[in-house]
Regions:
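Glycosyltransferase catalytic domains, chiefly GT-A lineage
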Residues: 1-134
């Protein structure tokens, strides 16, 4: 049975989620020693801007890019905020796109600093969500 981490990276006009995903994947490799799958709607951007992406991502799933009508406020500090498009609907398809039998779906801005998340694989449940964070 394979285990791995699935990251979604769908950039908007201001946030490079692919860059975040690459950093996140480097931490996953260091602390969890798990394969990482990147699901993105801009494969060409990944290939052009991150030439060494295969070091970080074991699998790539190309998502269809759809027009987005969703907008979200992003806050950067106390006095700065921007309302930007938010491409997050594909996460609902995580079970359909993951190449792993057991998958941790992780936000790209999560910074891993230990192997605590590996405990998630000890549970025989179809869906787990953290009630408290450490």
């Amino acid at each position: 049975m394979t285990q791995g981490v699935l990251l979604f990276a769908q950039n908007n006009s201001h946030i490079d989620y692919v860059k975040q995903a690459q950093f996140c994947a480097s931490r996953i490799k260091k602390y969890l020693q798990l394969p990482v799958c990147l699901a993105t709607d801009n494969l060409e951007y990944l290939k052009q801007n991150y030439k060494n992406y295969k070091v970080y991502f074991d699998e790539i799933v190309e998502l269809q890019r759809h027009p987005v009508n969703y907008r979200k406020k992003f806050r950067d500090g106390l006095y700065s905020e921007k309302t930007l498009e938010w491409r997050n609907l594909s996460r609902a398809d995580a079970w359909d796109v993951t190449p792993f039998a057991k998958t941790i779906v992780m936000d790209t801005d999560l910074i891993i600093g230990n192997n605590t998340l590996l405990k998630a694989f000890d549970y025989n449940q179809e869906f787990l969500i953290a009630k408290e964070s450490i």
